[in-house]
Amino acid sequence: ENHIAAIESDRGGFAPRGFTCDGSEANLEWLKSQAQLFEDYDLHVFEKGYGGVDIGPLKKEYPEIALFGFVPDSQRYFDMHHSPNDVFENVNKRELELGAAAVASFLYLLDQQFK
């Protein structure tokens, strides 16, 4: 089994803003090269960063793995996170759909890159 990439979404279900990469310089350059495809949708964060706490341990088993993190808008994160407001009924359906579309598009591009 060979793991080459992983993605995590664990920063809330808010409007998408981009993706971060914990990987090689080549992985980071690839990520940055994808930014133009997302510009029209107001995604602008394509930078070196943290993949996520849940996928982080994969680096021990697969040192070359590229870890990507989905970055949503963070303005209201602590209005919800671990508060009484942190229930599914309070999730903005449109923002969740936009995030799902961004991640699906990103995964398609990732698949094309690592074929």
Language-model-derived ranges and their functions:
Residues 77-115:
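His/Asp/Glu-rich mid-to-C-terminal helical/loop segments that flank catalytic regions of hydrolases
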